[in-house]
């Protein structure tokens, strides 16, 4: 029985080996191009997918870089706008201060002119009163012959009237 098993086993091995060899020959003859075509198509699809993914990654990186540049430019522009606003505000403040100083100087000069005019008018009024009092004093002195004491009293009262005026 062991010889029978051995010869059956060898026969089975030969038949199976022949069948496998025949199968490979048939596959090579009839289906090899389709099978390799499927593998090549699959390889090409994977390569295309990798290329597409690489392009998408590069586009995403370019987009991210562009957005970062735009953000940086926006920040720079915002800082410039803020700086310009500060400068404009300071210039406007300086202008307002300058205008206020000019107006204050103008008002001060006008006040000085008004004071000088009022002083001149007051002096003119005082001169008029002094002239009137002088004439009145001279008339009194001429009308009456006064002695020295009476003249002195008259002059003192004249000076007192000038002080009151």
From Swiss-Prot:
GO terms for molecular function: proton-transporting ATP synthase activity, rotational mechanism; proton-transporting ATPase activity, rotational mechanism. It is found in: Cell membrane. The chain crosses the membrane at residues 7-27. It comes from the Bacteria. It is a single-pass membrane protein. GO terms for cellular component: plasma membrane; proton-transporting ATP synthase complex. Keywords: ATP synthesis, Cell membrane, CF(0), Hydrogen ion transport, Ion transport, Membrane, Transmembrane, Transmembrane helix, Transport. Belongs to the ATPase B chain family. F(1)F(0) ATP synthase produces ATP from ADP in the presence of a proton or sodium gradient. F-type ATPases consist of two structural domains, F(1) containing the extramembraneous catalytic core and F(0) containing the membrane proton channel, linked together by a central stalk and a peripheral stalk. During catalysis, ATP synthesis in the catalytic domain of F(1) is coupled via a rotary mechanism of the central stalk subunits to proton translocation. Component of the F(0) channel, it forms part of the peripheral stalk, linking F(1) to F(0). F-type ATPases have 2 components, F(1) - the catalytic core - and F(0) - the membrane proton channel. F(1) has five subunits: alpha(3), beta(3), gamma(1), delta(1), epsilon(1). F(0) has three main subunits: a(1), b(2) and c(10-14). The alpha and beta chains form an alternating ring which encloses part of the gamma chain. F(1) is attached to F(0) by a central stalk formed by the gamma and epsilon chains, while a peripheral stalk is formed by the delta and b chains. This is ATP synthase subunit b. It comes from Streptococcus agalactiae serotype V (strain ATCC BAA-611 / 2603 V/R). The lineage of its organism: Bacteria, Bacillati, Bacillota, Bacilli, Lactobacillales.
